[in-house]
Every structure is written in structure tokens, then in C-alpha cells.
């Protein structure tokens, strides 16, 4: 590298380093068990029944990608209408995408030669499942954030009401502050010269 800087030429391309700019992480180069659940790969151990990161009340996504659960005969949206993601609907007009969703729309290199510099496309169907999975997790996180914000606001209002003095106490403090109190046998305010 130092020799290349001295000669003025660029160093040889190293696999794994971006040349033009940052690229999305190639999920296909990971071990398949890190990308897919146990139901997708026949030789892998089964995935746990529910992800341990989210509380059970917020789970709306099935434990496997939607296409896998649909193939196994399970319902696509278990849990009723509350569990549906708040993302764009496939039959309605598509709103403008946020920055995170635009990043999801970018092609994800999944072929082994993806870092060599050539443009690659993900296998058909895989990208859609990953996007759907990401949208469902995003909807869960938004619901959790909304619930936490509502709970925080409720607690803040309760604390305000609990610490607010009664109107009688305010009146008493006002009257006692305006009345001159007898000094008694205490030391005078000003010491004599």
C-alpha cells in the first residue's frame, strides 16, 4: 500500500473493499443459518418459536418469512387486524418511501462475485420476502415506540398531578408569606454597631 502511494498508482483491488462508494452488505455471503430461519434450510436446526428480542405482545410477523408460512398452510397475518404492518398496501397507491425504505429498495448483491465489482441481482422472491420482513419488524418497532411514548406521557401527567399542591395549601402559603411574623426571642435581623 505504501509502495503504491509512492509510485502514484492505486493499490490492487481488494475483495471486500468498496471502490466507488458504500454498497449494501452482501447477505448471500453469510452462512445460510444467519440469513434464513430453520424452516427454509432442511439441514439446519429449527429456529426458536418466537424471536426473543421483542415481547410477545408486539409480534405480528410469523417466525418464518411470509412465503414459507403460506407454503406450510399457515395464515399470513396471525393475530388479527392490529398485527398488520402500517406500510404501503400492494393494492393501493404507493406513497413516497422513507430513506430506510429507499435503502431497502436498492438491489442487494447476493452472488459470490458481488464484491468483485459486477452488478448482480438477488434471487427472485428473496428480496421481496426480506423487504416484507423488514417492514413487519419496522411496524412492530413503531408500535412499541408509540406505546412507550403514550406510557411516558401518562406517567408524566400523573406525576404533575401528584406533586401539584392543593389550592388550600397555596392560599395558606400566600397568607403566611404576607403576614409579618413575630420575631420573639430570636436574634434581631441587624446587629447593633
UniProtKB/Swiss-Prot annotation:
InterPro entries found in the cross-reference section: Bbc3
Biological process terms in GO annotation: apoptotic signaling pathway; cellular response to hypoxia; cellular response to ionizing radiation; determination of adult lifespan; DNA damage response; execution phase of apoptosis; fibroblast apoptotic process; intrinsic apoptotic signaling pathway
Region (Disordered): 1-28, 71-138
Residues found modified as Phosphoserine: 10
Motif BH3 positions after renumbering to this chain: 137-151
Cellular component terms (Gene Ontology): cytosol; mitochondrial outer membrane; mitochondrion
Locations listed in the record: Mitochondrion
Biased segments, Low complexity type: 71-82
Domain of life where this protein originates: Eukaryota
Pfam families, sorted: PUMA (PF15826)
UniProt induction comment: Up-regulated by TP53. Up-regulated by DNA damage, glucocorticoid treatment and growth factor deprivation. Up-regulated by ER stress in a DDIT3/CHOP-dependent manner.
Keywords annotated in UniProt: Apoptosis, Mitochondrion, Phosphoprotein
Tissue: Ubiquitously expressed.
Protein family membership: Belongs to the Bcl-2 family.
PANTHER family documented for this protein: BCL-2-BINDING COMPONENT 3, BCL-2-BINDING COMPONENT 3, ISOFORMS 3_4
Record remark: domains: The BH3 motif is intrinsically disordered in the absence of a binding partner but folds upon binding. Folds when bound to BCL2L1. Also folds when bound to MCL1.
Record note on quaternary structure: Interacts with MCL1 and BCL2A1. Interacts (via BH3 domain) with BCL2. Interacts with BCL2L1/BCL-XL. Interacts (via BH3 domain) with NOL3/ARC (via CARD domain); this interaction prevents BBC3 association with BCL2 and results in CASP8 activation.
Role this protein plays: Essential mediator of p53/TP53-dependent and p53/TP53-independent apoptosis. Promotes partial unfolding of BCL2L1 and dissociation of BCL2L1 from p53/TP53, releasing the bound p53/TP53 to induce apoptosis. Regulates ER stress-induced neuronal apoptosis.
Name the UniProt record assigns to this protein: Bcl-2-binding component 3, isoforms 1/2
This protein's encoding gene: BBC3
Amino acid at each position: 500500500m505504501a509502495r503504491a502511494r509512492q509510485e502514484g498508482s492505486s493499490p490492487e483491488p481488494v475483495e471486500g473493499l468498496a471502490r466507488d462508494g458504500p454498497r449494501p452488505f452482501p447477505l448471500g455471503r453469510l452462512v445460510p443459518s444467519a440469513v434464513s430461519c430453520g424452516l427454509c434450510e432442511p439441514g439446519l436446526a429449527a429456529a426458536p418459536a418466537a424471536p426473543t428480542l421483542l415481547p410477545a405482545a408486539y409480534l405480528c410477523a410469523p417466525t418464518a418469512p411470509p412465503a414459507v408460512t403460506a407454503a406450510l398452510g399457515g395464515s399470513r397475518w396471525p393475530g388479527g387486524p392490529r398485527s398488520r404492518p402500517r406500510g404501503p398496501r400492494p393494492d393501493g397507491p404507493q406513497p413516497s418511501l422513507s430513506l430506510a425504505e429507499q435503502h431497502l429498495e436498492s438491489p442487494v448483491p447476493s452472488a459470490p462475485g458481488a464484491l468483485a465489482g459486477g452488478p448482480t441481482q438477488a434471487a427472485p422472491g428473496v428480496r421481496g420476502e426480506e423487504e416484507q420482513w423488514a417492514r413487519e419488524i419496522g411496524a412492530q418497532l413503531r408500535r412499541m415506540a408509540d406505546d412507550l411514548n403514550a406510557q411516558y406521557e401518562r406517567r408524566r401527567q400523573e406525576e404533575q398531578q401528584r406533586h401539584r399542591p392543593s389550592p388550600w395549601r397555596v392560599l395558606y402559603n400566600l397568607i403566611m408569606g404576607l403576614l409579618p411574623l413575630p420575631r420573639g426571642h430570636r436574634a434581631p435581623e441587624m446587629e447593633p454597631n
